[in-house]
């Protein structure tokens, strides 16, 4: 009964909120079939992955970098992944006129494909790359079609738009600015282990005074920073909210 009441309370909070911010992690995409790269059996379990995905490796060996980049993220098959119920739910909130911004740690671009327009890609995106000289952008299909993608104008090897090891987070300040404006922070599908993003719930709860909601299958160790905790898959959480209408 308490569980049902929590769903109803969160539904009403979202209904009344002026500004909603959503932080998403791997759990938002695993329901689309995308592997959790940071899981025990994920791609990041390979000790060499951090080197292959580093800024230094790209600078030293850009051709080899692209070979490993494509293998690690399996970009040749990436078109098969589609937005799931969680992605659509967030897009629907926006369509209803809600001021909602998504801060995502995911690099798959599925929030945008699912219809969300206000997305801050904290770790960049697999969907695009750009020329390091003239800044011309190229899409995923171009990367798939070229073994080592080069700029058609400059012939420079493209720079991926994923944030690499050794890079700063270019969108970090924009994300924090949004946190300080928000009424509600929903954290979905992340273990909150990677800094500086792991500090976002504490900022929202302790400094901003926002209502905070956690949706994650596993406990994070940060439950004290949340007003509501749902130990569910995101699809289950969305279904629980929908059934309260």
From Swiss-Prot:
Give residues annotated as binding nicotinamide.
Answer: 37, 107-108
Q: Which cellular components does GO assign to this protein?
A: cytoplasm
Q: Where does the record place the Deacetylase sirtuin-type domain?
A: 1-245
Q: What cofactor requirement does the entry state?
A: Zn(2+)
**Active site (record annotation):** 123
Task: Identify the Gene3D superfamilies for this entry.
Answer: SIR2/SIRT2 'Small Domain, TPP-binding domain
Primary location: cytoplasm
- Matches recorded under SUPFAM superfamilies: DHS-like NAD/FAD-binding domain (SSF52467)
Q: What reactions does this protein catalyze?
A: N(6)-acetyl-L-lysyl-[protein] + NAD(+) + H2O = 2''-O-acetyl-ADP-D-ribose + nicotinamide + L-lysyl-[protein]
InterPro entries the UniProt entry points to: DHS-like_NAD/FAD-binding_dom, NAD-dep_sirtuin_deacylases, Sirtuin, Sirtuin_cat_small_dom_sf, Sirtuin_class_U, Ssirtuin_cat_dom
> Which residues does Zn(2+) bind?
131, 134, 151, 154
Keywords of this entry: Cytoplasm, Metal-binding, NAD, Transferase, Zinc
One Pfam family from the record: SIR2
Q: Where found in the cell?
A: Cytoplasm
Which amino acid positions bind NAD(+), per UniProt?
A: 26, 30, 37-38, 105, 107-108, 123, 190-191, 216, 234
- Cofactor remark from the record: Binds 1 zinc ion per subunit.
Looking at the keywords, is Metal-binding present? Answer: yes
Listed GO MF terms: histone deacetylase activity, NAD-dependent; NAD+ binding; zinc ion binding
Q: Which EC number(s) are documented for this chain? A: 2.3.1.286
Source species, domain of life: Bacteria
Q: Explain the purpose of this protein.
A: NAD-dependent protein deacetylase which modulates the activities of several enzymes which are inactive in their acetylated form.
Q: Which NCBIfam families match?
A: PRK00481.1-1, PRK00481.1-4
Question: Which family does the UniProt entry place this protein in?
Answer: Belongs to the sirtuin family. Class U subfamily.
HAMAP family for the chain? Sirtuin_ClassU
State what protein this is by name: NAD-dependent protein deacetylase
Q: What is the lineage of its organism?
A: Bacteria, Bacillati, Bacillota, Bacilli, Bacillales
Quote the gene name from the UniProt entry. cobB
């Amino acid at each position: 009964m308490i569980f049902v009441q929590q769903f109803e309370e969160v539904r009403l909070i979202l209904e009344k909120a002026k500004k909603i911010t959503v932080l998403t992690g791997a759990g938002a995409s695993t329901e689309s079939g995308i592997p959790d790269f940071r899981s025990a059996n994920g791609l990041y379990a390979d000790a060499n992955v951090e080197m292959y995905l580093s800024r230094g490796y790209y600078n030293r060996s850009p051709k080899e970098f692209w070979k490993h980049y494509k293998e690690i993220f399996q970009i040749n098959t990436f078109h098969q992944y589609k937005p799931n119920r969680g992605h659509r739910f967030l897009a629907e909130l926006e369509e209803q006129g809600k001021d909602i911004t998504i801060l995502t740690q995911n690099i798959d671009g599925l929030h945008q494909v699912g219809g969300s327009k206000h997305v801050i890609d904290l770790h960049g995106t697999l969907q695009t790359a750009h020329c390091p000289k003239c800044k011309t952008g190229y899409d995923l299909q171009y990367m798939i079609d070229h073994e080592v993608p080069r700029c058609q104008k400059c012939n420079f090897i493209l720079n991926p738009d994923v944030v690499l090891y050794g890079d700063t987070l270019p969108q970090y300040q924009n994300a924090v600015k949004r946190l300080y404006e928000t009424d509600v922070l929903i954290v979905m599908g992340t273990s909150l282990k990677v800094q500086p993003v792991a500090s976002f719930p504490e900022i929202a709860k302790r400094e901003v005074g926002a209502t905070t909601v956690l949706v994650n299958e596993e406990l994070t160790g940060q439950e004290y920073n949340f007003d509501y905790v749902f130990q569910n898959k995101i699809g289950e959480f969305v279904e629980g909210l929908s059934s309260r209408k």
